[in-house]
Structure formats: structure tokens, C-alpha cells
């Protein structure tokens, strides 16, 4: 089957490479000539474990190609995916759908053969209706159906998530469109991956509801962590104790500095805007957004408290900048607010991240980027572990004691055993643990 993937960013590139690996003939399309040329040369625009190798293998096999020419690329494609960005619109938090609608207009002008048009981008309820209207109003006589197929990929584990999904959600009620989508996902269908067919609007809402629920779990355990600190309980024990209940589950119950990234902040705001537009407020999600925003700054204040309440003139080493490990994504990363809180208090900040420093340097120019963790730690009055990269899970504390100006560690991801770190002679602060 020929598949056209419009948009070669994170979702489009991962999805396109995985579809090609399934045996489909895939062309990834993007207006950015520089990006397409780089992809042709094997240079990835993002860091995702295994992606460069997957792309190279499928390009070599002749199943994956890249183009800036949408009209030529969609010719004879049976499925055309829209995988362009939907960033938060400035001012109101609604998803900016201008890129999606621009693609719909271009498809309307160039569609020559029957195709199922699939919105892979995360879009608010009713977007598929508008995409369909744009194309139908062009007067095209070519058969097409608009389908919703949201992605549920985790950055850092996207390839595994795509190939071994918990479920595949497809918003399509037309029998022909359902048949095309079954063929698209045939390898997973044969492996008995759950495929849920719903209405298009239900599919669009499922994506937002899922992300809002996960954001709620994260925020809940973070608030429990704060309570644990007050009452002398251990949030990790609390998390295990409730997570063993099958009705709750253990995932997303790890206390930390709050959620960030390209999905949860954007999607919770978009859901709130949709709820407002339909006069059906979701107060729980409103509270989640508010609590999470305040938490990031609170983690900066926690670091200042570990410094004795005074950060002016102090040197703070940050380990990890990206919103999670195994990605270079700095979007809405907790480190941004933590750094700003420290800088506002007069601290000097030195940081190291295995993959995120290039992106971080552009948004936090006042921060000194170190070549490795130990270089960041040298002369530091406090060490703040922000992102739980594997590279930070086995630090040499004897070496750190020699390098650091003061043995103070703030572990915002609860990576270490408090007794172990204290035994090494450190003043140790973690999240939600006595």
C-alpha cells in the first residue's frame, strides 16, 4: 500500500518509518526543504532512540522516501496522513489548526485518486468535520473519507509504542475507510493489537481525554508527595501501595517536578478551551493545569531551601534539562521554570544534559552548558537532579565530594536511596520522602 505522510516532524517521521518497516511504500512530505534534504542524507531532525537506524534501513530497502512536492507524492496514495503541528494558539490556549487546514486545502486542490485522509495530528473535536468540509467545497469528484487516528507515542519509546501499541483508535464509520485502515495496520491487526473503531468525534476526544487523565495521575501523586513530606510518609511506598490496585495501576505515579513536553501542557489547555466553547467546564483538569504550573517553580524554591534559603552568589549544577530522558525535547520542560527561579534568586546555574543542551541553550542563554555531569558539578554549592537520564543513575559520590564546593544534593526524581547518599556525606533532599 502507498502511504503519504504530510509532515515530517516527530509524529510524521516516526509513523512514516514504522509504516515503511511494515512493508508499505511511504513518502514523508514537508515544506521545509532543509529538513527534507537532511533526511535524505540520514540526518534526523529529532533525537529518538532507534529512529535513525530505522529510517536508514527502510530508505535502503526502497520503502521510505522524502519529498517537498505534495501533489506528486499523494498520487495513487490510498492513505494520506496529516501529521503537522498543532501548537497552542497564543492568547487562548486553543490548538492552532492553521497547518492542518492548509494541508486540507492543498489536498483539495491536488487529490486525483481515491484516498482515505487521516488526521494523525492531535486535534480538537470537530476538526475532521472541518477538514472534510474544506475538501468537499473544492468540488472534487474524487472519492475520499476523512478519518481520525490519534497517536499515543511516548517520546523516548516511540518506535516500541508504535509497533506494540496498547490500542489503535480509528474514528471511521464508513466501511471502505475502515477497510483501508485495517490494511494500513494489517501487521498489527494480525498480531491481535486491539483496534477500536469509533465515530470521528469520539476518536478526537479520546486523545485529549487520555492525556488529561495521565496528567491528572502525575499531578495527584505530586500533591501526595507534598503531603508525605508534612506527615512523615514515603511517597514511593504510597505510590506502590495504590499502584498495586488494578483499578489504579502503577504507571504515571512517580513523584517529581511536574509534567512537561509537547503533549500534556498543550493538550490539557486545548481540552479546557473545547470545554469552554461547549459550555461544559472540566474543573478537575483546570486544577491540574494550575497545580502543575505552580509546582515547577516550587521545585526551584526547594533547591533554594537546600542552599539554606539563600541562592545569591551560589553555583547550582543542574543534571538534566529535557522534560524526560531519551529525548532532546525542551518544550515546557520543568527545568525552564526551575532555572528561572534560581536565576531570579541570584544563583549561577551550570547544566548538563546528554541530548538537550543545544535546544536548552537557545531558551536559557544565562545558563552555562557543561560537557559532562562532573564538569557541571565542579565548584557547585548544590546539585539538582532534574531529569532521570540513565547517565545520572550511578554517579560517583566520592568524586562528586572532591569536585563540589558543598555536598548538597536535591534529587527531584527520587533516583537515589537517601541512606546511601547521606552515608556518602551529603545533605540530601528528595521529593515526598522523609
What are these regions (language model features)?
Residues 1-434:
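Structural/interface elements that position substrates and couple domains in central-metabolism enzymes
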Amino acid at each position: 500500500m502507498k502511504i503519504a505522510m504530510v509532515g515530517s516532524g516527530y509524529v510524521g517521521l516516526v509513523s512514516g518509518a514504522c509504516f515503511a518497516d511494515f512493508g508499505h511504500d511511504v513518502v514523508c512530505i514537508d515544506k521545509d526543504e532543509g529538513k527534507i534534504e537532511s533526511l535524505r542524507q540520514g540526518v534526523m531532525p529529532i533525537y529518538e532512540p532507534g529512529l535513525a537506524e530505522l529510517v536508514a534501513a527502510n530508505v535502503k530497502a526502497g520503502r521510505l522516501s522524502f519529498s517537498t512536492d505534495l501533489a506528486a507524492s499523494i498520487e495513487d496514495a490510498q492513505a494520506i496522513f496529516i501529521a503537522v503541528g498543532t501548537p497552542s494558539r497564543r492568547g487562548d490556549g486553543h490548538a492552532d489548526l492553521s497547518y492542518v487546514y492548509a494541508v486540507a486545502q492543498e489536498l483539495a486542490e491536488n487529490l486525483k485518486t481515491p484516498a482515505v485522509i487521516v488526521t494523525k495530528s492531535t486535534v480538537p473535536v470537530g476538526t475532521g468535520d472541518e477538514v472534510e468540509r474544506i475538501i468537499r467545497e473544492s468540488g472534487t469528484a474524487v472519492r475520499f473519507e476523512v478519518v481520525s487516528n490519534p497517536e499515543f507515542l511516548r517520546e523516548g519509546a516511540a518506535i516500541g509504542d508504535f509497533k506494540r501499541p496498547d490500542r489503535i483508535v480509528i474514528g471511521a464509520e464508513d466501511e471502505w475507510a475502515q477497510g483501508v485502515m485495517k490494511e494500513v495496520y494489517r501487521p498489527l491487526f494480525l498480531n491481535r493489537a486491539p483496534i477500536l473503531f469509533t465515530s470521528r468525534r469520539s476518536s478526537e476526544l479520546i486523545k485529549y481525554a487520555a492525556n488529561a487523565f495521565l496528567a491528572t495521575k502525575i499531578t495527584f501523586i505530586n500533591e501526595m508527595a507534598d503531603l508525605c513530606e508534612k506527615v512523615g510518609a514515603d511517597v514511593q511506598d504510597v505510590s506502590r501501595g495504590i499502584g498495586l490496585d488494578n483499578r489504579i495501576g502503577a504507571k504515571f505515579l512517580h513523584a517529581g517536578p511536574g509534567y512537561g513536553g509537547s503533549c500534556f501542557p498543550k493538550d490539557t489547555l486545548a481540552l479546557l478551551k473545547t470545554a469552554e466553547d461547549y459550555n461544559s467546564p472540566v474543573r478537575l483538569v483546570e486544577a491540574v493545569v494550575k497545580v502543575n504550573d505552580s509546582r515547577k517553580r516550587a521545585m526551584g524554591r526547594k533547591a533554594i531551601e537546600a542552599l539554606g534559603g539563600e541562592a545569591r552568589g551560589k553555583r547550582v549544577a543542574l543534571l538534566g534539562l529535557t522534560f524526560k530522558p531519551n529525548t532532546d525535547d525542551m518544550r515546557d520542560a520543568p527545568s525552564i521554570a526551575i532555572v528561572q527561579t534560581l536565576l531570579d534568586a541570584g544563583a549561577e546555574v551550570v547544566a548538563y544534559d546528554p541530548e538537550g543542551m543545544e535546544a536548552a541553550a537557545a531558551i536559557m542563554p544565562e545558563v552555562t552548558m557543561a560537557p559532562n555531569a562532573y564538569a557541571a558539578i565542579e565548584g557547585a554549592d548544590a546539585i539538582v537532579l532534574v531529569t532521570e537520564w540513565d547517565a545520572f543513575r550511578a554517579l560517583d559520590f566520592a568524586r562528586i565530594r572532591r569536585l563540589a564546593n558543598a555536598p548538597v544534593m536535591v534529587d527531584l526524581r527520587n533516583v537515589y536511596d537517601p541512606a546511601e547518599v547521606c552515608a556518602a556525606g551529603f545533605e540530601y533532599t528528595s521529593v515526598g520522602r522523609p
